[in-house]
Amino acid sequence: MVGSALRRGAHAYVYLVSKASHISRGHQHQAWGSRPPAAECATQRAPGSVVELLGKSYPQDDHSNLTRKVLTRVGRNLHNQQHHPLWLIKERVKEHFYKQYVGRFGTPLFSVYDNLSPVVTTWQNFDSLLIPADHPSRKKGDNYYLNRTHMLRAHTSAHQWDLLHAGLDAFLVVGDVYRRDQIDSQHYPIFHQLEAVRLFSKHELFAGIKDGESLQLFEQSSRSAHKQETHTMEAVKLVEFDLKQTLTRLMAHLFGDELEIRWVDCYFPFTHPSFEMEINFHGEWLEVLGCGVMEQQLVNSAGAQDRIGWAFGLGLERLAMILYDIPDIRLFWCEDERFLKQFCVSNINQKVKFQPLSKYPAVINDISFWLPSENYAENDFYDLVRTIGGDLVEKVDLIDKFVHPKTHKTSHCYRITYRHMERTLSQREVRHIHQALQEAAVQLLGVEGRF
């Protein structure tokens, strides 16, 4: 893994810093093309050191894997920057909920939390949501850990338990989330989610239902594909209906009343039954969110034993890319006025169609290497590519796998597409970056180069 390799070869930092400094000279375009500051090439700190983040100190240990590239993004809060496309989506959803769901005194039923710290405990991110200790979503290769006890949240669901425990029963949470992932136009290590939760008391759920006073929220039975063991079928079906109706109205508000929707059964550790919503957009079915009836064990542990509820989570980038026809997720981090001014509208519901910036030519280079005998994770390589290449890297494709018939060693060949969003890249500058990546892969990942 990157961490163990760094601890074995800390001297490699000095070389990479020197190399990166050479590459970055003469590149002054801060929005997209400049190499990160030289120190950012050191992807982790050794155990015993401390990382300062958002005014707090976090001791490093063998679980720490937060890259400096990601650290520079923490606190940007794109969803709170006025007229940013992610802010527009958030405001449209918030406006819809404020208008459609009103409490007894005319105030909004749903409260909104859009400035919660992205640093959470592993208990908040996993255990509070009933995610098993051996669940693959906990893997170091998929998350950004500050240390064994703290991490950058992988989903806004990490705040569900705390808000329920505080006595809230209807709320939206919006924030940046962090996951180690592949590199292409649809994936970025930081993206933004909007989470919603609503709980119902027996009176609230069955109000207006004929003979509703005789119905119950809970029973002791067996779990099935349609309900949890503690829920009555009547309660589950009403919660499911309210959830799907709420989301159908939201999507109609965003995309128009003629939108075609379908529901797909799925699995999440913290809801059952669980669903994904797909929309038919220009003839293509697109998955836009996940949702379900909240696991009663989670609700009970937060102190709301007399209530049943639903939850959903959607990606703001996903919706914005569909609604505004934005082709590349990197654009959300662009500071180019040609991008941002397209979303400076007086009415948040005004239709916007993104006008592409000039498409500069790509520079494509391949990298091949033999994998180490153990501890290689593909997301470690992707993280290294992002750290060395920054936002110049448009995508990375694994184009070939080969197992040597005699040594049984495995070789990977990746095709890396470099493209600047604001100017043409030269072969020379890409060659310097690519060479630094090759050397970093050998020294930090323990691979054997085939270049």
From Swiss-Prot:
InterPro entries: aa-tRNA-synth_II, aa-tRNA-synth_II/BPL/LPL, Fdx_antiC-bd, Fdx_antiC-bd_sf, Phe-tRNA-synth_IIc_mito, Phenylalanyl-tRNA_Synthase. Keywords: Acetylation, Aminoacyl-tRNA synthetase, ATP-binding, Disease variant, Hereditary spastic paraplegia, Ligase, Mitochondrion, Neurodegeneration, Nucleotide-binding, Primary mitochondrial disease, Protein biosynthesis, Transit peptide. One of its GO terms (molecular function) is tRNA binding. GO terms for cellular component: cytoplasm; mitochondrial matrix; mitochondrion. The keyword Protein transport does not apply. Residues 358-450 form the FDX-ACB domain. It comes from the Eukaryota. It is found in: Mitochondrion matrix; Mitochondrion. It catalyses: tRNA(Phe) + L-phenylalanine + ATP = L-phenylalanyl-tRNA(Phe) + AMP + diphosphate + H(+). Its main location: mitochondrion. Monomer. PANTHER family: PHENYLALANINE--TRNA LIGASE, MITOCHONDRIAL, PHENYLALANYL-TRNA SYNTHETASE. Is responsible for the charging of tRNA(Phe) with phenylalanine in mitochondrial translation. To a lesser extent, also catalyzes direct attachment of m-Tyr (an oxidized version of Phe) to tRNA(Phe), thereby opening the way for delivery of the misacylated tRNA to the ribosome and incorporation of ROS-damaged amino acid into proteins. NCBIfam families: pheS_mito. This is Phenylalanine--tRNA ligase, mitochondrial.
